[in-house]
A protein has these predicted regions:
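Structural and coupling elements of P-loop NTPases
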Residues: 1-600
Length: 600
């Protein structure tokens, strides 16, 4: 155990964490040069396409290190690569509980970001040893001295404690690994009896052949093939079919011992048995369980329906399987008069939702209709009853509502001084209450504010990047519930409400949102064989309306000559047919239209 080091890398999105991990794998010969590719640890196709880490990924490296004049010693370095985006911070928190230290990686061209501070606070709370490092020092835009001063101020460390590396060229990687060995403590057993086994589940995945495969950090004892084990929470007993490590692919091992990070194949194929934060013990053991994780609460909700109701069972199976690889979303069945049976699903953010929908399509070939994302509201009706509403389409009629409460968020924005004015304007436009501001390093400022969660989800992140030329960053945490002056906005197509387009908006922006939604739908909705109105309705009245003209079909094209009477009869017949279609017709809305409106 003395020669094991377990660590993670804390970094904001796009600060080069995965690239640095690539260089570590290369330097330690964990991956052969001929097999090297960018983002080796990003296993999902989506991660590679988007250039972001979505799922954490553990890997074991071997590294020979000299402690002095004597012979070199071999060390086992277990790295857990983690996501940098705020929507996947739960993945990061789980990784941090399985390690003893973390590298705080800061982009030398960008500086310390707000989300990095949030993750750093989590690491410090867990008592992890922090090793600061500046990345991208080879960039001509690097401001090494300036950013190093920021890191020193943030951590309270010395300038010489901050290492300088380049994930691109590999410069400084050897020194960084040496620092990991010197400064991050070796793992320690917690139980007196060395034969008692305890493993913390920090992630799991599902295999059609092997069943549930749990990713574990072994805190005490050891486990091997054919050992009888139990999930302490579910009380489900099973036989260890295989134990092993990640290198970075799964490699079976005779035993998995205290201090190590690896996997256990359970053979269990039932959903809902394994859970992140559970402890794996020997069957019939009375050993105390390890402290688990606090499950995150969803931030946004959306209803998801199969494009065809014949595919409902396929969607249900897909959700069961997805939850075996992503335990951070929650779902329950619901029904809509227009869209049929579906599920209301809670996500950690809008990016989490986008990735989820994309995975449904790619991994399970399920085409879905997704409603406009929403947050939760507490609504008190005039009859005195209070209910928590997650779907805008379930909002009561405006005349029945006594009051509405919504969650607010506390946000922290870090920005160069030059962009403070447009950011203050952006905060004003999103109904924020501005708080204190503090100087943060040389030429930057840290701003505090509070605003409604619905306003944060209304494109705030993208707008912040836009007004600050990409230099500002933001982190947030859910705060208190407050009074909400909002209304339900329905979109009607051919005089029928389409629940998927219903949203809750501020009364101040009701007309603006109504016109914007109608205009966008008008532009993307294919024309029908009959005239169809697109309308926005709120507070009992139509606020905006536009008419989609009918698709013209030449019913006289097959006629020759100048029989005008025959042509007139055919056109009159077509007119009557379109009138009937309009009276009874439902507009066919393709699935991609729902996705386009969801992003509006």
């Amino acid at each position: 155990m003395q020669n094991i080091r377990n660590f993670s890398i804390i970094a904001h999105i796009d600060h080069g964490k995965s690239t640095l991990a690539d260089r570590m794998l290369e330097f330690t010969n964990t991956v052969e040069k001929r097999k090297m590719k960018d983002q080796v640890l990003d296993q999902m196709e989506l991660e590679r396409e988007r250039g972001i880490t979505i799922k954490m990924q553990p890997v074991r490296m071997r590294y020979a290190h000299s402690n002095g004049p004597g012979p070199e010693e071999e060390y086992t370095l277990n790295l857990i690569d983690t996501p940098g985006h705020i929507d996947f911070s739960y993945e990061v928190s789980r990784a941090l509980k399985a390690v003893e230290g973390a590298i705080l990686l800061v982009d030398a061209t960008q500086g310390v970001q707000a989300q990095t501070l949030t993750t750093l606070a989590m690491a410090r709370e867990l008592g992890l040893k922090i090793i600061p490092a500046l990345n991208k020092i080879d960039s001509p835009l690097a401001r090494v001295d300036e950013i190093k001063a920021e890191v020193v101020e943030t951590l309270g460390c010395l300038p010489e404690d901050v290492l300088e590396v380049s994930g691109k060229t590999g410069s400084g990687v050897e020194e960084l690994l040496e620092e990991v060995i010197k400064k991050i403590p070796a793992p320690k057993r917690e139980l007196e009896n060395e034969k008692d086994f305890r493993g913390l589940i920090f992630d799991f995945q599902y295999s059609d052949h092997k069943g549930i495969i749990v990713f574990v950090r072994v805190f005490d004892g050891e486990v091997k093939k054919n050992d009888k084990l139990v999930f302490s929470q579910a009380k489900e007993k099973f036989i260890c079919l295989e134990a092993g490590i990640f290198s970075p692919e799964a490699v079976p091992k005779a035993t998995l011992s205290a201090g190590e990070i690896g996997y256990i194949v359970t053979g269990i194929k039932k959903p809902g048995i394994a859970s992140v934060g559970d402890t794996v013990l020997f069957a019939n053991s009375n050993t105390q369980t390890l402290g688990g994780y606090m499950k995150p609460s969803p931030v946004v909700w959306a209803s998801v329906y199969p494009e065809s109701q014949d595919d409902f069972a396929d969607l249900a199976r897909a959700l069961d399987k997805l939850q075996l690889t992503d335990s951070s979303f929650s779902y329950e069945e619901e029904a809509s008069g227009l869209l049929g049976r579906g599920f209301r699903i809670g996500f950690l953010g809008t990016l989490h939702m986008e990735i989820f929908v994309e995975r449904l399509h790619r991994e399970f070939s399920v085409e879905v209709i997704v409603t406009t994302p929403s947050i939760m509201y507490d609504i008190k009706s005039k009859n005195g009853k209070t209910q928590r509403i997650y779907s805008p389409s379930l909002f009561p009629d405006f005349g029945d509502i006594e009051s509405i409460q919504e969650p607010w968020v506390d946000i922290e924005v870090i920005t160069p001084n030059d962009y403070m004015s447009p950011i203050m304007q952006l905060l004003f436009e999103h109904e924020a209450e501005q708080g204190d501001s503090d100087v943060f390093g040389d030429g930057r400022i840290k701003m505090h504010a509070q605003l409604p969660l619905r306003e944060l989800m209304r494109g705030f992140f993208d707008k912040l990047k836009s007004v600050s030329a990409g230099y500002a960053s933001v982190s947030y945490k859910i705060g208190e519930m407050r009074h909400a002056d909002v209304a339900r906005l329905d979109i009607l197509v051919a005089e029928e409400i389409v629940p998927a387009f219903t949203k809750v908006v501020s009364k101040k922006r009701l007309e603006e949102e109504a016109q914007s939604s109608v205009e966008k739908l008008y532009k993307v909705l294919p024309r029908q064989m009959f005239v169809a109105k697109i309308q926005a309705q709120a507070l009992g009245r139509i606020i905006s309306s536009k008419t989609l003209s009918a698709l013209k079909k030449d019913v006289t094209g097959h006629l020759y000559g100048g029989d005008i009477t025959r042509k007139m009869k055919l056109r009159e017949k077509q007119k009557k047919g379109k009138k009937k279609m309009k009276e009874r017709g439902k507009v066919n809305i393709p699935q991609d239209i729902f996705l386009k409106m969801m992003k509006s």
